[in-house]
């Protein structure tokens, strides 16, 4: 499933085509996505200007002039592509054959910018939903989410307090969207490797007896910010289904130090160990026992 960097990459790709422009036409080719599209979905979008395009955790949020918000989630295999309204491709643009299969083009927006924005999702685990901006605090998909890891509210003090007393593993705590929003398996593995912290370590060790951040918390917050920033610059990680809006592959997977590198040499200078894999809470965890303590 796309994580924060992949979703942010999509947002950056959609912004020039959507933000500040009117949805001249909205088409739904099938309504049965992960959750059925609302009956008034097309009516509430047609003619509306997208005043802003943001992101919360792994969700895209398009603010509309009407006061509504269009929430979009990519699911497992969802992707957007942006083409000219007549379907022509920009010269030099690469489109993966999967995202070009029109049988999976479920939602299409023709924008006043001249762009056609197409949501393609073979597995149909993605979804879209419209709700009033005034009700955003009560929106079930957003309610209870922790702070954004790239936002000002996220720091070592906040993370230490959120993990104080938690006897769960550090990895499990970081995957809890109530602790920090938008992190997934890939970037948690990478951040823990950069911080030299074991995924098996208890989350409580990020705080001292006064619930103040330990050195572990300081290292980890820095590592989380760094790995997410690097991944966004690289356009995300393309392991299976993720594509940028241009159809191009992200390439951060070529920089993985831990994730999906089982048996390979650890990239920490002077370590000499090898990356290991084990199943933790139903997910593969990749780490180096030699330098992650």
UniProtKB/Swiss-Prot annotation:
CDD domains noted in UniProt: EcFpg-like_N
Keyword list, A-Z: DNA damage, DNA repair, DNA-binding, Glycosidase, Hydrolase, Lyase, Metal-binding, Multifunctional enzyme, Zinc, Zinc-finger
EC number(s) stated in the UniProt entry for this protein: 3.2.2.23, 4.2.99.18
Signal peptide: none
Active site positions, chain numbering: 2 (schiff-base intermediate with dna), 3 (proton donor), 58 (proton donor), 283 (proton donor)
Pfam families: Fapy_DNA_glyco, H2TH
Swiss-Prot/TrEMBL GO biological process terms: base-excision repair
ZnF endpoints (FPG-type): 257-293
The organism's place on the tree of life at top rank: Bacteria
SUPFAM superfamilies in alphabetical order: Glucocorticoid receptor-like (DNA-binding domain), N-terminal domain of MutM-like DNA repair proteins, S13-like H2TH domain
Binding site for DNA: 104, 123, 166
Cofactor binding annotation: Binds 1 zinc ion per subunit.
Cofactor(s) this protein requires: Zn(2+)
Family to which this protein belongs: Belongs to the FPG family.
Subunit relationships: Monomer.
PANTHER family assigned: FORMAMIDOPYRIMIDINE-DNA GLYCOSYLASE (PTHR22993:SF9)
NCBIfam families, sorted: fpg, PRK01103.1
Protein name in UniProt: Formamidopyrimidine-DNA glycosylase
Species per Swiss-Prot/TrEMBL record: Rhodopseudomonas palustris (strain BisB5)
Top-level taxonomy: Bacteria, Pseudomonadati, Pseudomonadota, Alphaproteobacteria, Hyphomicrobiales
């Amino acid at each position: 499933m796309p994580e924060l960097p992949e979703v942010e990459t999509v947002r950056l790709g959609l912004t020039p085509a959507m933000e500040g422009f009117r949805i001249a036409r909205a088409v739904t080719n099938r309504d049965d996505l992960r959750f059925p599209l609302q009956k008034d979905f097309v009516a509430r979008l047609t003619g509306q200007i997208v005043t802003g395009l943001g992101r919360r955790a792994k969700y895209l949020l398009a603010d509309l002039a009407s006061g509504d918000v269009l929430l979009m989630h990519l699911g497992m295999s969802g992707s957007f592509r942006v083409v000219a309204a007549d379907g022509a491709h920009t010269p030099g643009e690469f489109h993966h054959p999967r995202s070009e299969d029109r049988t999976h083009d479920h939602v299409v927006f023709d924008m006043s910018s001249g762009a056609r924005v197409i949501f393609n999702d073979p597995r149909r685990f993605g979804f879209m939903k419209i709700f009033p901006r005034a009700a955003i605090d009560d929106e079930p998909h957003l309610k209870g989410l922790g702070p954004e890891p790239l936002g000002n509210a996220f720091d070592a003090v906040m993370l230490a307090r959120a993990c104080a007393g938690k006897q769960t593993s550090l990895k499990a705590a970081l995957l809890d969207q109530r602790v920090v929003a938008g992190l997934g398996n890939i970037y948690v593995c990478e951040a823990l490797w950069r911080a030299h912290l074991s995924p098996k370590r208890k989350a409580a060790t990020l705080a001292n007896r006064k619930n103040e951040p330990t050195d572990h918390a300081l290292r980890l917050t820095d590592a989380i910010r760094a790995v997410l920033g690097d991944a966004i610059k690289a356009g995300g990680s393309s392991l299976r289904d993720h594509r940028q809006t241009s159809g191009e592959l992200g390439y951060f997977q070529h920089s993985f130090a831990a994730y999906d590198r089982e048996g390979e040499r650890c990239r920490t200078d002077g370590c000499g160990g090898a990356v290991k894999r084990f199943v933790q809470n139903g997910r593969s965890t990749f780490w180096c026992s030699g330098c992650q303590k």
